[in-house]
């Protein structure tokens, strides 16, 4: 009876270690996926901010030039 317990205990121990390693790999893969998504969202926000910033600067520049032209001609 005791001789049967040793191999079973060894199999259980090896199976537990194997399962633990698989779970660690799976968790590492899931973490990498989250980082990629975060980078993707950040890039999208960054691009949108650049686009909005450029358009606001163009509009502000046009308004500023119109105001300067108005002041120069004293038509304000």
From Swiss-Prot:
It comes from the Eukaryota. It is found in: Secreted. Keywords: Amphibian defense peptide, Antimicrobial, Cleavage on pair of basic residues, Disulfide bond, Secreted, Signal. Pfam families: FSAP_sig_propep. One of its GO terms (biological process) is defense response. Residues 1-22 form the signal peptide. Expressed by the skin glands. Disulfide bonds join 70-76. InterPro entries: Frog_antimicrobial_propeptide. GO terms for cellular component: extracellular region. Residues 23-37 form a propeptide. Its main location: secreted. Belongs to the frog skin active peptide (FSAP) family. Esculentin subfamily. Antimicrobial peptide. This is Esculentin-2MT1. It comes from Amolops mantzorum.
């Amino acid at each position: 009876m005791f001789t049967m317990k040793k191999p079973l205990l060894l199999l259980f121990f090896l199976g537990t270690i194997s399962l633990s390693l698989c779970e660690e790999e799976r968790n590492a893969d899931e973490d990498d996926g989250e980082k990629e998504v975060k980078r993707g969202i950040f890039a999208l926000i960054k691009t949108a901010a650049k686009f909005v910033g450029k358009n606001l600067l163009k509009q502000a520049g046009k308004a500023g030039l119109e105001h300067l032209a108005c002041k120069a001609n004293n038509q304000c």
